[in-house]
Amino acid sequence: SDVYKVSDQAKGHPINGFVAPGYEPVLEVFKENFLKRDEIGAACAVFRGQTPVVDLWGGYRDKVKTELWQANTMACVHSSTKAIMAIAMAMAVSRGYFRLNDTVASHWPEFAQNDKQDITIRQILDHSAGLPVVEELLTLEQLADYEGLGEILARQETQWQPGPRHGYHGWTIGMYCNE
């Protein structure tokens, strides 16, 4: 068989799914979340190209452990792409596309609006640019219109003097890095 079916327990939490040969360490780390980190419920899917090589789920959907986590249990996930974005930005730096201390406006002149001409790429990435929000209420259509969204982001005013203060740019960091 090209996959190993999984039906296991970790600290009383059922774990189900499959792992392809060579991906067994993913199962072990998945189980560790229950054994060592008091995970209640979780899922993990890994694809290599178009081929699924790991599909695991286990535990419970609720803290009182009455509803099992199923293969199709929905979960709200935040910040899952920030690591990928950071890797992409680091690769762009290593390939010489820009330097972290470059001003954003040196690559995106429209960004200089509203006294933002000195904000650096580093400040966008380290959450000190003063741009944690977009003041304009955005529609789904605007979020999907990258060119139009770029114009809105360029107009945005900072919420504080960039540099000395930090404030999590959780929703906006990806938008600015996209530019």
Regions found by a protein language model. Give the residues of each.
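Hydrophobic (often cysteine-bearing) scaffold residues that line and stabilize catalytic clefts
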Residues: 22-26, 77-81, 85, 117, ...
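Short glycine/serine- and small hydrophobic-enriched flexible loop segments
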Residues: 90-97, 175-179
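Catalytic-site signature segments of enzymes, centered on catalytic residues
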Residues: 134-179
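Short, compositionally biased leader-like segments
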Residues: 1-23
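Active-site helix/loop module of the DD-peptidase/beta-lactamase fold
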Residues: 71, 76-80, 92-136, 154-155
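Short, conserved catalytic-motif segment at the N-terminal edge
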Residues: 16-77, 99, 155-156
